[in-house]
A protein has these predicted regions:
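Bacterial N-terminal signal peptides
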Residues: 2-13
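Structural scaffold elements adjacent to functional motifs in cytosolic proteins
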Residues: 41-43
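Rhodanese-like catalytic fold shared by cysteine-dependent sulfurtransferases
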Residues: 12-35, 51-100, 110-197
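Short, glycine/acidic-enriched loop or turn micro-motifs at the edges of active sites
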Residues: 46
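Short, surface-exposed ligand- or partner-binding patches at beta-edge/loop junctions that are enriched
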Residues: 105
Length: 197
């Protein structure tokens, strides 16, 4: 009887329990967009990044974080601060189904990993983290924080070409189609009014 109770407790846990988002490269995301039905590219960067840095063709903009008017030092550099978009899940739910393939793209894979986890926890079955992002990580980049810091200091000290530049990986690196054009169909719906798909 005890075994049956354990199976019921752990076997019937909430949707997404223990599940992690799938991780793919932008080139794999592009292939899915062209071959797998009900697949959508969701650019979770801020509206400013989407407009001024450019975005993939047919990428829906649903910012995971929003800029504030607070300017402060964060990590290594002073910059405008970001805050969590409190209606991110609500807005996604107005347009996309929990069974759609949602390919989440940001600048370098940092925010997309967080957003994909949040979608999985909310019951979205096919949330994908496009982990190389639109622009890719800053060069050089390492997962090990100590190694990352050491090599970045080394590159900075020696004036290595491309230091702190992106585009060594990501959507643009692969030469995938992107644009600056702002099609209202793909702009963040609250900025327009009614949701569109």
């Amino acid at each position: 009887m005890f075994l049956v109770v354990l199976v019921l407790i752990f076997g019937c846990a909430g949707v997404g329990y223990g599940q992690e988002p799938k991780r793919i490269l932008s080139v794999e995301a592009f292939d899915m967009l062209n071959t797998v039905p009900d697949t959508y590219l969701v650019d979770i960067r801020t509206q400013a990044e989407y407009q001024f840095v450019g975005h993939p063709f047919k990428a829906y903009n649903y910012p995971y974080l929003l800029f504030t008017t607070t300017f402060a030092k964060d990590d290594e550099k002073p910059s405008y601060q970001l805050t969590k978009n409190k209606v991110f899940l609500e807005q996604i739910g107005k347009v996309f189904k929990k069974t759609d393939n949602l390919l989440l793209l940001d600048r370098d894979g940092t925010r997309s990993a967080q957003a994909a986890k949040e979608l999985v926890s909310a019951g979205y079955k096919n949330a994908f983290d496009v982990y190389d992002g639109f622009e890719g990580a800053e060069f050089p980049a390492f997962d090990d924080p100590n190694k990352h810091k050491y090599y970045r200091q080394l590159a900075k000290r020696n004036n290595i070409y491309g230091f702190e530049h992106r585009r060594h990986s990501g959507w643009q690196f692969w030469g995938l189609p992107w644009t600056y054009e702002m099609d209202p169909k793909y702009v963040y719906p609250p900025d327009l009014g009614a949701p569109q798909k």
